[in-house]
C-alpha cells in the first residue's frame, strides 16, 4: 500500500516480490485521504515528505482478532507469514542488487 507519491517504489517492490515468490501479491496506490491507506506507521513518513510503503495481510479485514485481546499467536498463520517473509527477503535482495553501482 502506498500514497500516490510512493507509487513508483510500490511498483518496484511488487515486481521484485513477484519475481522472488509465488505467493499472491496485490498492491494499491491511493491518495492519502483514502480510508485505510494511512492506517499505520508508514503514513508518518509521508507527513514528513518521505516515501513509505506498508506490507499488509489486510489486518482486521482478514483476522477478526486484530488489535483485540484475542489477538494471540494461535490466531496467526505462521506458514503464510513465513512465505511472505521469504518473498520480502528476496525482493529486498533484488532491489539492493539493482541499486548497487
Region locations from a protein language model:
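Active-site-adjacent substrate-binding region
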Residues: 1-101
Amino acid at each position: 500500500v502506498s500514497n500516490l507519491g510512493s507509487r513508483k517504489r510500490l511498483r518496484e517492490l511488487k515486481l521484485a516480490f513477484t519475481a522472488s515468490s509465488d505467493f499472491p501479491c496485490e498492491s494499491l496506490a491511493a491518495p492519502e485521504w483514502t480510508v485505510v491507506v494511512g492506517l499505520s506507521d508508514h503514513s508518518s513518513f509521508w507527513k514528513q515528505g518521505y516515501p513509505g510503503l506498508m506490507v499488509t495481510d489486510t489486518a482486521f479485514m482478514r483476522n477478526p482478532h486484530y488489535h483485540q485481546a484475542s489477538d494471540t499467536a494461535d490466531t496467526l498463520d505462521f506458514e503464510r507469514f513465513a512465505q511472505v517473509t521469504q518473498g520480502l527477503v528476496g525482493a529486498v535482495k533484488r532491489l539492493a542488487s539493482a541499486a548497487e553501482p
